[in-house]
Regions:
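Conserved SAM-binding loop of SAM-dependent methyltransferases across substrates and taxa
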Residues: 51-64
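S-adenosyl-L-methionine
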Residues: 71-119
């Protein structure tokens, strides 16, 4: 068995044994072990939630006083008292308003493990993933609180550095991480974005409006 296959099999078996919906749960667990971003009482929005591995982990960490909203076009299989599911397309022009209506207040944490169907064409998959991520970033001024945190999945490629530069305008720190639970051969990376500055974003939006007049 190849090393990457062995790792995938290990986490699949571990997920089944420990009662997690998917092996992807361990990616978020490992990210949280490093950054301690999920805490009791937090409000979380998780994009690309199906089947529910990340929601399950987030739900455990935020507890009964927290809230987790999962957003996906597919059915989300996990349910709990502190979890709601929104079956929707992120390109729906009204989705940020819909999400806002679901949330008790602006989110502390935004998670994105979303991806489209993989074509196997490296550049094509990379650019599609960047577009998805940019779409989610566009929601931040509407749904994320000041000093919030985001974790965003991207695929390696030429646009990653540009995206990080853009994110650093609104976040104090942006780091690239590949959790051990990710397959060795996978091109996926996670951008961990810490300490969101909503005032900077609002200022930039104002400047953009002025420039278009």
């Amino acid at each position: 068995m190849k090393l990457s296959d062995a790792k995938r099999d290990f986490y699949r078996k571990k997920a089944k044994k420990q009662g997690y919906i998917s092996r992807a749960a361990y990616k978020l667990i490992q990210l949280n072990q490093k950054y301690k971003i999920l805490n009791n009482g937090d409000i979380v929005v998780d994009f690309g939630s199906a089947p529910g591995g990340w929601i399950q982990v987030a739900s455990d960490y935020v507890g009964s006083s927290g809230f987790v909203l999962g957003v996906d076009q597919r059915e989300i299989k996990y349910d709990n008292k502190n979890v709601k599911s929104l079956i929707s397309d992120i390109y729906d022009p009204e989705i940020h308003n819909t999400i806002t209506n679901y949330l008790p207040k602006k989110a502390d944490i935004i998670l994105s493990d979303i991806s489209q169907n993989i074509s196997g064409i490296w550049d094509l998959d990379h650019f599609k993933q960047i577009d998805l991520t940019k779409r989610i970033i566009s929601f931040f001024p509407h749904i994320m609180r000041n000093r919030g945190t985001a974790i965003l999945k991207v695929f390696t490629g030429v646009e990653v550095d540009k995206l990080i530069s853009r994110l650093k305008i609104g976040f104090k720190k942006v780091e690239i991480v590949k959790p051990h639970a990710s397959r060795s051969k996978s091109s996926e990376l996670y951008l961990v974005c810490l300490n969101y500055n909503s005032k900077v974003i609002e200022y930039l939006k104002m400047i953009e409006v002025e420039e278009t007049k």
